[in-house]
Curated annotation (Swiss-Prot):
Required co-factors: Mg(2+)
Enzyme's top EC category: ligase
Function of the protein: DNA ligase that seals nicks in double-stranded DNA during DNA replication, DNA recombination and DNA repair.
Catalytic activity: ATP + (deoxyribonucleotide)n-3'-hydroxyl + 5'-phospho-(deoxyribonucleotide)m = (deoxyribonucleotide)n+m + AMP + diphosphate
Record organism: Mycobacterium avium (strain 104)
This protein's encoding gene: lig
PROSITE patterns, A to Z: DNA_LIGASE_A1, DNA_LIGASE_A2, DNA_LIGASE_A3
Binding site for ATP: 228, 235, 250, 279, 319, 391, 397
Active site residues per record: 230 (n6-amp-lysine intermediate)
Gene Ontology biological-process annotations: cell division; DNA biosynthetic process; DNA recombination; DNA repair; DNA replication
A GO MF label: DNA binding
Keywords: ATP-binding, Cell cycle, Cell division, DNA damage, DNA recombination, DNA repair, DNA replication, Ligase, Magnesium, Metal-binding, Nucleotide-binding
Top-level lineage group: Bacteria
Name this polypeptide is given: Probable DNA ligase
InterPro entries linked: ATP-dep_DNA_ligase, DNA_ligae_ATP-dep_bac/arc, DNA_ligase_ATP-dep, DNA_ligase_ATP-dep_C, DNA_ligase_ATP-dep_cent, DNA_ligase_ATP-dep_CS, DNA_ligase_ATP-dep_N, DNA_ligase_N_sf
Length: 526
């Protein structure tokens, strides 16, 4: 039976939820891959179903955002006794929730969400809660998922990885691989075109590793590095085909309509076909950067673009180029790509640069960049290619960090190799007016195995109301020092603020909760 006439599969939400639990419960990469591959075979050859399953097990919704925040997930109805929800039906429910708009939208979304949870079993509710809350960390992310797709389809993992890198969308690649289009990934030239670099289709962006300082960055790049100012704006990927410009976020969402300034700047360039990396940023009259949140506000779904442009226009700075008028530059060295960019983009729309082997010169460049209000520098290897979709060693970020002493309010049980350990900590800042603690974020980053053992014992002692649930509430007594990249506005937490990239440095047994940083100290970083 050909794929086009094969009977389409029915997969229940329960099947995905149990697979997720199984994957989260094993530290074995091979076992994770095998479990996911088995589920994907069941979903095949239904391309849409495969794409949904891959998205969910990667911790993402097909719809990206559906307007459901932390507050909406705090309570849920009693669970259903038996599983009846199909994956397709739940995906349709997500789409319906995301489409709600206008007066009474919040109440309507809440009603739809309640109906969905009421039809879900306890296992399914737990999965939905973690998926919608952004807490689905189970190791079933890009690398493992790509291997699982390859195993399920019987094709090389490298083919899947490259297709996902260039297509920018692993669910779409999985759908093609498991719906009879595997030739598109394994070598037939006519089909392979579907997953090559193409103007108008976003590419998974290259990401940076971290270096402790400029001297380390120079050493890791072989004795010389290209330093660039790291702007605290919003990364954008810009595509141009003739007079058509499309702008994507780093998560590959199309935001063209919200960023007319980027479109105008791109149309002014002497080029017909372009894929470029850039940074959109709100600047003050003196060209110093506005707070990150000012830039981020332009990316909201309900933004009044005309009013926003009039109130605070955005500027765009280009820092890399992937394609120019028929020439793919992904595999070209950094120096060649930057030369192509310099020939195309005016200096006023380029980030400041310094090519040097001298740590002192690099240090002065970093200091000047920070003095200008930017967040740090990027150090790039002169000979490195553009490693789309990877946190490549060719890019290193160097920036100062802020530290806060916060109080642990609750802890979540871990999964995978952290199964049986209290892992993800809820962080609170002290409210000097009430003496209470205001939640401002969560983190599981920076914890060593020894730290996990210690905090499991410590927070078991501090637990309030038992340790049987997924989230263990604790007495607010333990102070922890965390490093953060900054703070942003957020409706997710009661304090209205959220920490950016928080990671644990150490527990401060020398400090009591009364010595923890206040919510005012957190606001000062905003």
């Amino acid at each position: 039976m050909s794929p086009s006439h094969a009977k389409l599969a029915t997969v229940l939400l329960f099947d995905v939820a149990t697979a997720s639990a199984d994957v989260g419960g094993t530290p074995s990469r091979l076992t994770k891959v095998a479990r996911i591959a088995d589920l994907l075979r069941r979903a095949a050859p239904d391309a849409a179903l495969v794409a949904i399953v891959v998205s969910w097990l990667s911790g993402e919704l097909r719809q990206r955002q559906i307007g459901v925040g932390w507050a909406a997930l705090r309570s849920r109805p009693p669970a259903a006794a038996h599983p009846t929800l199909t994956v397709v039906a739940v995906d349709a429910a997500f789409a319906e929730i995301g489409a709600v708009a206008g007066k009474g939208a919040q109440a309507r979304r809440a009603a739809l969400l309640n109906a969905l949870f009421a039809a879900a079993t306890e296992t399914e509710q737990t999965f939905l809660l973690r998926l919608l809350g952004g807490e689905l960390r189970q190791g079933a992310l890009a690398g493992i998922m790509a291997d699982a797709v390859a195993r399920a389809a019987g094709i090389p993992a490298a083919a899947v990885q490259r297709a996902a890198m260039l297509g920018g969308d692993l669910p779409a690649v999985a759908a093609a691989a498991l719906s009879g289009e595997a030739a598109a990934l394994s070598g037939e030239a006519s089909a392979l075109d579907a997953f090559t670099l193409r103007v108008g289709r976003p590419v998974a962006p290259m990401l940076a590793q971290t270096a402790a300082g400029v001297a380390e960055a120079i050493e890791r790049h072989g004795g010389q590095a290209i330093f660039e100012a790291k702007l605290d704006g919003a990364r954008v990927q810009i595509h141009r085909a003739g007079d058509q410009v499309t702008v994507y976020t780093r998560s590959l969402d199309d935001v063209t309509a919200r960023l007319p300034e980027v479109v105008t700047a791109t149309l002014a360039l002497p080029v017909e076909a372009l894929i470029a990396d850039g940074e959109a940023i709100a600047l003050r009259p003196d060209n110093s950067p506005q707070r990150f949140q000012v830039t981020a506000s332009r990316f909201g779904r309900s933004v009044d673009v005309a009013a926003a442009v009039a109130a605070q226009p955005l500027s765009v700075f280009f820092f890399d180029i992937l394609h120019c008028d028929g020439v793919d530059l992904l595999d070209a060295p950094t120096t060649d790509r930057l030369a192509a960019l310099d020939a195309l983009v005016p200096p006023a729309q380029r980030v400041d640069q310094l090519l040097t082997a001298d740590p002192d010169a690099a240090g002065r460049f970093l200091e000047a960049t920070l003095a200008a209000g930017h967040e740090g520098v990027m150090a790039k290897a002169p000979g490195a290619p553009y490693q789309a979709g990877r946190r490549g060693a060719g890019w290193l970020k160097v920036k100062p960090v802020h530290t806060l002493d916060l109080v642990v309010l609750a802890v979540e049980w871990g999964s995978g190799r952290r199964r049986g350990k209290l892992s993800n900590i809820h962080l609170g800042a002290r409210d000097p007016a009430t003496g209470e603690f205001v939640m401002v974020g969560k983190t599981f980053k920076g914890m060593t195995d020894a730290m996990l053992d210690w905090q499991t014992a410590r927070f078991t002692e501090l637990a309030v109301g038992g340790t049987d649930g997924y989230v263990v509430r604790v007495r607010p007594e333990q102070v922890v020092e965390v490093a953060v990249d900054g703070v942003q506005k957020s409706s997710r937490y009661p304090g209205g603020l959220a920490l950016r990239f928080a990671r644990v440095l150490r527990y401060r047994d020398d400090k009591g909760p009364a010595e923890a940083d206040t919510i005012d100290a957190v606001r000062a970083l905003y």
